[in-house]
Amino acid sequence: MAKKSKQYQDAAKLVDRDKAYDVTEAVDLVKKMDFAKFDATVEVAFKLNVDTKQADQQLRGAVVLPNGTGKDQTVIVFAKGDKAKEAEEAGADFVGETDLVQKIQDGWLDFDVAIATPDMMAQVGRLGRVLGPKGLMPNPKTGTVTMDVAKAVNDSKAGKVTYRTDRDGNVHVPVGKVSFDTDKLVGNFKTIEDTIVKARPASVRGTFIQNLVVTSTFTPAVRVDLASF
């Protein structure tokens, strides 16, 4: 196991591992600990009481953060005709049909979000092995397979993030950058927490959110008190 840097070790001394912090206090602490030489991403991680072997307990969706993500998203849209024009007018960075599919098959992946109209999915489906592992495959559950391409583009540009349980029931979601004011990070954090709570599968029994932490790119995790929401 790699040895942690002195900066990380110094940051870890600021965290009481036996304490669950108020959400605002936790975010402040992460900002204080951050030592990256760039504007690091702040991320929240949920440990959920779900059995991901059960299809109805696999969470997946998307939410628009009220204060954005701090990242300019490059958005592509697979569409034709009026829908292609609609996507362009909404500010999509690249719009195309077979040509765009071919471009990706040739190795181009310089984008953050892919959106498609339903009638394009027969062609886009050929990209599953390329886009799927990178989390870029258009999907109705995340609002990226839709006829309302203008809304999808606008949401993505405004700060939409996706979430999905991994096989151990964890969900990791970015909430912004260390440079954000604490209240903006907390606002995004609360929006995600509310979204996850509302997505609770009906079949889950007992405590749904078992643990919740916030961290940045290089800092230790800080446990958050769920009662502070």
Swiss-Prot record:
Transmembrane segments: none
Entry GO MF terms: rRNA binding; structural constituent of ribosome; tRNA binding
Family annotation (PROSITE patterns): RIBOSOMAL_L1
Record GO biological process: regulation of translation; translation
UniProt GO cellular component terms: large ribosomal subunit
The keyword Repressor is assigned to this record: yes
Keyword Acetylation: no
Keywords of this entry: Repressor, Ribonucleoprotein, Ribosomal protein, RNA-binding, rRNA-binding, Translation regulation, tRNA-binding
Pfam families found in the cross-reference section: Ribosomal_L1
Alphabetized HAMAP family for the sequence: Ribosomal_uL1_B
Known partners and oligomeric status: Part of the 50S ribosomal subunit.
NCBIfam families per UniProt: rplA_bact
Family affiliation: Belongs to the universal ribosomal protein uL1 family.
Function field: Binds directly to 23S rRNA. The L1 stalk is quite mobile in the ribosome, and is involved in E site tRNA release. Protein L1 is also a translational repressor protein, it controls the translation of the L11 operon by binding to its mRNA.
PANTHER family referenced in this protein's UniProt entry, alphabetically: 54S RIBOSOMAL PROTEIN L1, MITOCHONDRIAL, LARGE RIBOSOMAL SUBUNIT PROTEIN UL1M
Name the UniProt record assigns to this protein: Large ribosomal subunit protein uL1
Gene: rplA
